[in-house]
Amino acid sequence: MIQALHEAGIRPDIISGVSAGSVVSVFYADGKEPHEVVDLFETLSFKDLTSLSINRKGLLVLDDFIEFLSSNLSVKNLEELKTPVVVTATDLDHGCSVSFRSGNIAERVAASCSLPVLFTPQNIEGTWYVDGGVLMNFPVSVIREECDKIIGLNVSPLITDEYNQSILSIAQRAYHFMFQANAISEKRKCDLLIETNGLQDYSNHELGKVEEIFLKGYNAANDILYALKQEKRTIWNTPL
Protein backbone atom coordinates (compact mmCIF):
# COMPACT_ATOMS: atom_id res chain seq x y z
CA MET A 1 0.00 0.00 0.00
CA ILE A 2 2.86 2.37 0.77
CA GLN A 3 4.17 1.83 -2.77
CA ALA A 4 0.91 3.03 -4.32
CA LEU A 5 0.85 6.14 -2.11
CA HIS A 6 4.52 6.67 -2.89
CA GLU A 7 3.81 6.63 -6.64
CA ALA A 8 0.93 9.07 -6.10
CA GLY A 9 3.35 11.51 -4.51
CA ILE A 10 2.01 11.02 -0.99
CA ARG A 11 4.78 10.98 1.62
CA PRO A 12 4.18 10.85 5.39
CA ASP A 13 5.58 13.41 7.81
CA ILE A 14 5.31 10.88 10.66
CA ILE A 15 4.52 7.16 10.83
CA SER A 16 2.90 5.10 13.55
CA GLY A 17 3.36 1.34 13.42
CA VAL A 18 2.71 -1.76 15.49
CA SER A 19 3.88 -5.36 15.17
CA ALA A 20 4.68 -6.17 11.51
CA GLY A 21 3.66 -2.62 10.60
CA SER A 22 6.46 -1.27 12.76
CA VAL A 23 8.96 -3.34 10.76
CA VAL A 24 7.88 -1.83 7.44
CA SER A 25 7.66 1.62 9.03
CA VAL A 26 11.25 1.77 10.25
CA PHE A 27 12.71 0.50 6.99
CA TYR A 28 10.68 3.02 4.99
CA ALA A 29 11.61 5.82 7.39
CA ASP A 30 15.24 4.80 7.01
CA GLY A 31 15.04 5.64 3.31
CA LYS A 32 14.30 2.28 1.71
CA GLU A 33 11.80 2.11 -1.12
CA PRO A 34 8.81 -0.20 -0.45
CA HIS A 35 9.99 -2.75 -3.02
CA GLU A 36 13.42 -2.80 -1.35
CA VAL A 37 11.77 -3.82 1.91
CA VAL A 38 10.08 -6.69 0.05
CA ASP A 39 13.45 -7.74 -1.38
CA LEU A 40 14.91 -7.89 2.13
CA PHE A 41 12.38 -10.46 3.30
CA GLU A 42 11.48 -12.58 0.28
CA THR A 43 14.67 -14.67 0.45
CA LEU A 44 14.26 -15.32 4.19
CA SER A 45 12.28 -17.94 6.06
CA PHE A 46 10.65 -17.61 9.47
CA LYS A 47 13.37 -19.89 10.86
CA ASP A 48 16.05 -17.43 9.74
CA LEU A 49 14.71 -14.81 12.14
CA THR A 50 13.78 -16.93 15.15
CA SER A 51 15.22 -19.69 17.30
CA LEU A 52 13.88 -21.99 19.99
CA SER A 53 13.69 -20.50 23.45
CA ILE A 54 15.55 -22.14 26.31
CA ASN A 55 13.52 -20.24 28.91
CA ARG A 56 9.87 -20.58 29.86
CA LYS A 57 8.73 -17.15 28.73
CA GLY A 58 7.92 -18.11 25.14
CA LEU A 59 8.41 -20.78 22.49
CA LEU A 60 10.79 -18.72 20.37
CA VAL A 61 13.27 -15.89 20.82
CA LEU A 62 13.80 -12.99 18.42
CA ASP A 63 17.56 -12.51 18.83
CA ASP A 64 18.16 -13.31 15.14
CA PHE A 65 15.39 -10.90 14.14
CA ILE A 66 17.00 -8.15 16.22
CA GLU A 67 20.34 -8.83 14.54
CA PHE A 68 18.68 -8.76 11.11
CA LEU A 69 17.12 -5.36 11.81
CA SER A 70 20.35 -3.92 13.20
CA SER A 71 22.33 -5.14 10.18
CA ASN A 72 19.93 -3.73 7.59
CA LEU A 73 19.17 -0.31 9.08
CA SER A 74 21.55 2.59 8.54
CA VAL A 75 20.93 4.08 11.99
CA LYS A 76 20.59 2.63 15.49
CA ASN A 77 17.96 4.78 17.20
CA LEU A 78 14.40 5.82 16.33
CA GLU A 79 15.18 9.52 16.67
CA GLU A 80 17.83 9.18 13.93
CA LEU A 81 15.43 7.99 11.22
CA LYS A 82 14.76 10.31 8.28
CA THR A 83 11.03 10.28 9.00
CA PRO A 84 9.79 10.15 12.62
CA VAL A 85 8.35 6.77 13.61
CA VAL A 86 6.31 5.86 16.67
CA VAL A 87 6.54 2.16 17.59
CA THR A 88 3.82 0.80 19.86
CA ALA A 89 4.36 -2.07 22.29
CA THR A 90 2.53 -3.38 25.36
CA ASP A 91 4.11 -2.93 28.78
CA LEU A 92 3.52 -6.33 30.34
CA ASP A 93 4.58 -5.25 33.83
CA HIS A 94 2.28 -2.25 34.15
CA GLY A 95 -0.54 -3.28 31.82
CA CYS A 96 -0.44 -0.32 29.45
CA SER A 97 0.31 0.62 25.87
CA VAL A 98 3.66 2.36 25.29
CA SER A 99 4.66 4.45 22.28
CA PHE A 100 8.40 4.51 21.63
CA ARG A 101 9.76 7.59 19.85
CA SER A 102 13.43 7.17 20.71
CA GLY A 103 15.91 4.47 21.60
CA ASN A 104 17.24 1.34 19.94
CA ILE A 105 15.12 0.57 16.87
CA ALA A 106 15.69 -3.18 16.68
CA GLU A 107 14.86 -3.79 20.34
CA ARG A 108 11.69 -1.71 20.24
CA VAL A 109 10.44 -3.22 16.99
CA ALA A 110 11.09 -6.70 18.36
CA ALA A 111 9.07 -5.76 21.44
CA SER A 112 6.22 -4.57 19.22
CA CYS A 113 6.28 -7.93 17.40
CA SER A 114 6.56 -10.23 20.43
CA LEU A 115 3.27 -12.10 20.31
CA PRO A 116 2.75 -13.63 23.77
CA VAL A 117 3.31 -17.38 24.10
CA LEU A 118 4.88 -17.61 20.63
CA PHE A 119 7.74 -15.20 21.38
CA THR A 120 9.63 -14.43 24.56
CA PRO A 121 8.80 -10.92 25.83
CA GLN A 122 11.47 -8.27 25.27
CA ASN A 123 13.17 -6.66 28.24
CA ILE A 124 13.97 -2.99 27.69
CA GLU A 125 15.56 -1.08 30.54
CA GLY A 126 14.15 -3.47 33.13
CA THR A 127 10.58 -3.64 31.79
CA TRP A 128 9.04 -6.55 29.89
CA TYR A 129 7.18 -5.79 26.65
CA VAL A 130 5.00 -7.83 24.29
CA ASP A 131 3.20 -7.23 21.00
CA GLY A 132 1.70 -3.75 20.77
CA GLY A 133 -1.45 -5.16 19.24
CA VAL A 134 -2.50 -6.66 22.57
CA LEU A 135 -3.82 -3.25 23.65
CA MET A 136 -3.56 -1.09 20.52
CA ASN A 137 -3.47 -2.85 17.17
CA PHE A 138 -4.06 0.26 15.06
CA PRO A 139 -2.19 3.11 16.81
CA VAL A 140 -3.76 6.21 15.29
CA SER A 141 -4.46 8.14 18.48
CA VAL A 142 -0.76 8.29 19.42
CA ILE A 143 -0.13 10.72 16.54
CA ARG A 144 -3.64 12.10 15.85
CA GLU A 145 -3.03 15.50 17.45
CA GLU A 146 0.23 15.93 15.54
CA CYS A 147 -1.35 15.43 12.13
CA ASP A 148 -3.68 17.48 9.96
CA LYS A 149 -4.66 14.34 8.05
CA ILE A 150 -4.07 10.64 8.62
CA ILE A 151 -4.10 7.73 6.19
CA GLY A 152 -4.59 4.38 7.91
CA LEU A 153 -3.24 1.22 6.27
CA ASN A 154 -4.69 -2.00 7.67
CA VAL A 155 -3.43 -5.47 6.79
CA SER A 156 -4.28 -7.19 10.06
CA PRO A 157 -6.51 -9.90 8.53
CA LEU A 158 -3.28 -11.88 7.93
CA ILE A 159 -4.61 -15.13 9.37
CA THR A 160 -5.92 -18.33 7.82
CA ASP A 161 -9.63 -19.17 8.01
CA GLU A 162 -8.89 -22.81 8.70
CA TYR A 163 -6.90 -23.69 11.78
CA ASN A 164 -5.90 -26.80 13.66
CA GLN A 165 -6.60 -27.50 17.29
CA SER A 166 -3.04 -27.06 18.55
CA ILE A 167 -2.48 -24.77 21.52
CA LEU A 168 -0.45 -22.38 19.35
CA SER A 169 -3.09 -22.17 16.61
CA ILE A 170 -5.87 -21.54 19.10
CA ALA A 171 -3.84 -18.86 20.89
CA GLN A 172 -2.99 -17.07 17.64
CA ARG A 173 -6.61 -17.09 16.49
CA ALA A 174 -7.81 -15.73 19.83
CA TYR A 175 -5.20 -12.97 19.69
CA HIS A 176 -6.35 -12.09 16.19
CA PHE A 177 -9.94 -11.56 17.35
CA MET A 178 -8.74 -9.46 20.27
CA PHE A 179 -6.50 -7.36 18.04
CA GLN A 180 -9.34 -6.72 15.61
CA ALA A 181 -11.66 -5.61 18.41
CA ASN A 182 -9.30 -3.00 19.84
CA ALA A 183 -8.68 -1.50 16.40
CA ILE A 184 -12.29 -0.49 15.71
CA SER A 185 -12.27 2.88 17.48
CA GLU A 186 -8.82 3.72 16.13
CA LYS A 187 -9.92 3.19 12.52
CA ARG A 188 -12.59 5.87 12.95
CA LYS A 189 -9.86 8.43 13.64
CA CYS A 190 -8.42 8.12 10.12
CA ASP A 191 -9.21 10.62 7.37
CA LEU A 192 -8.68 7.86 4.82
CA LEU A 193 -8.65 4.14 5.61
CA ILE A 194 -7.23 1.60 3.17
CA GLU A 195 -7.71 -2.06 4.01
CA THR A 196 -6.42 -5.08 2.13
CA ASN A 197 -8.85 -7.95 1.67
CA GLY A 198 -8.03 -11.42 0.41
CA LEU A 199 -5.23 -12.03 2.89
CA GLN A 200 -7.03 -14.77 4.78
CA ASP A 201 -5.03 -17.45 2.99
CA TYR A 202 -1.71 -16.14 4.29
CA SER A 203 0.00 -16.64 7.62
CA ASN A 204 2.04 -13.92 9.31
CA HIS A 205 5.03 -16.20 9.03
CA GLU A 206 4.97 -16.92 5.28
CA LEU A 207 7.88 -14.70 4.30
CA GLY A 208 8.24 -16.53 1.00
CA LYS A 209 4.90 -15.05 -0.09
CA VAL A 210 5.76 -11.48 0.84
CA GLU A 211 5.69 -10.43 -2.84
CA GLU A 212 2.13 -11.74 -3.24
CA ILE A 213 1.04 -9.93 -0.09
CA PHE A 214 2.78 -6.76 -1.28
CA LEU A 215 0.89 -6.86 -4.59
CA LYS A 216 -2.47 -7.32 -2.88
CA GLY A 217 -1.82 -4.26 -0.74
CA TYR A 218 -0.55 -2.30 -3.72
CA ASN A 219 -3.64 -3.11 -5.76
CA ALA A 220 -6.00 -2.32 -2.88
CA ALA A 221 -4.48 1.13 -2.43
CA ASN A 222 -4.50 1.82 -6.16
CA ASP A 223 -8.17 0.85 -6.35
CA ILE A 224 -9.02 3.40 -3.65
CA LEU A 225 -6.95 6.12 -5.30
CA TYR A 226 -8.51 5.37 -8.70
CA ALA A 227 -12.04 5.44 -7.29
CA LEU A 228 -11.42 8.82 -5.68
CA LYS A 229 -10.01 10.14 -8.94
CA GLN A 230 -13.05 8.94 -10.87
CA GLU A 231 -15.29 10.69 -8.36
CA LYS A 232 -13.10 13.79 -8.73
CA ARG A 233 -12.30 13.80 -5.05
CA THR A 234 -9.01 14.10 -3.18
CA ILE A 235 -7.71 11.42 -0.85
CA TRP A 236 -9.31 13.44 1.96
CA ASN A 237 -12.70 12.94 0.28
CA THR A 238 -13.02 16.62 -0.64
CA PRO A 239 -13.88 17.86 -4.16
CA LEU A 240 -10.98 18.48 -6.54
How should each PLM-predicted stretch be described?
Residues 1-18, 26-240:
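Patatin-like phospholipase
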